[in-house]
Amino acid sequence: MANQRPIYGFHAVNARLWQNPKSIVELYIQEGKSDARTREVLEKAANENIRVYFADADRLNAISKGARHQGVVGFIDASKNHVHLEDVLENLSEPPLLLILDGITDPHNLGACLRTADAMGVHAVIAPKDKSAGLNATVSKVASGAAETVPYITVTNLARTLRELKEYGIWIIGTDMGGNADLYHCDLPDSAAWVMGNEGDGMRRLTREHCDMLVSIPMFGTVESMNVSVSAGMVLSETRRQRVLKNEKA
């Protein structure tokens, strides 16, 4: 089936079992495994009427292409994973916090960004279809379950999407070494969409032009840049910190 993709490891499989079990086509469990985590997966799969097959380690290694699978591999129907941005925005109980990835094509970076986004309570991660890694087994593994919990939305025209976000009252904040404000000295808006470019080229020109603010992250050492997931974690954490302070003063 063209829309199927594998996921592997307990974090990814368990997250999918609890968040979107109907998207799971089948599971493969390593023969002889009977630990508590495996029993939990088997019990949940049985409750959801998901097909389970038992296979030897060589078979699972072949399916996961040598990646660490922990004895559990699943196949999901990716067509049942589609989320509309409008639905996300219209069903929030707090001001939106979004992460936009412009040109992040490495699956390890995408997975790390999704994990960071989940930790910081990001409501959706957005990326252009033509300049993104796309969800795959590597992304799911690195994300440690976050690829199954954080909506990942790819769009055909990122510039148009940025304009649409502004119509919802969301500020578009770009990260840039030459930004006109630094992260620790700017009053961040309640509704925010942070844009991260890739480590080599940064944001594309048109993306930059749609930003309401350009913010730099202060650097105190000798390196000139950080991994995109680290940068994302810093700006998202600062956004959450400022929200907490505002709520305490309200």
Swiss-Prot record:
Q: Where in the cell is it found?
A: Cytoplasm
- EC number(s) per UniProt? 2.1.1.185
Q: Which GO terms describe its cellular component?
A: cytosol
- Matching Gene3D superfamilies: 3.30.1330.30, 3.40.1280.10
Which residues of this UniProt protein bind S-adenosyl-L-methionine? 197, 217, 226
Assigned keywords, A-Z: Cytoplasm, Methyltransferase, rRNA processing, S-adenosyl-L-methionine, Transferase
Q: What molecular function does GO assign, one term?
A: rRNA (guanosine-2'-O-)-methyltransferase activity
**Which reaction equations make up its catalytic activity?**
guanosine(2251) in 23S rRNA + S-adenosyl-L-methionine = 2'-O-methylguanosine(2251) in 23S rRNA + S-adenosyl-L-homocysteine + H(+)
Which major enzyme category is it?
transferase
Q: What's this protein's function?
A: Specifically methylates the ribose of guanosine 2251 in 23S rRNA.
Q: Which family does it belong to?
A: Belongs to the class IV-like SAM-binding methyltransferase superfamily. RNA methyltransferase TrmH family. RlmB subfamily.
> What HAMAP family does this protein map onto?
23SrRNA_methyltr_B (MF_01887)
Identify the PANTHER family for this entry: 23S RRNA (GUANOSINE-2'-O-)-METHYLTRANSFERASE RLMB (PTHR46429:SF1)
**What's the protein here called?**
23S rRNA (guanosine-2'-O-)-methyltransferase RlmB
Q: Which organism is it from?
A: Neisseria meningitidis serogroup A / serotype 4A (strain DSM 15465 / Z2491)
Q: Which gene encodes it?
A: rlmB
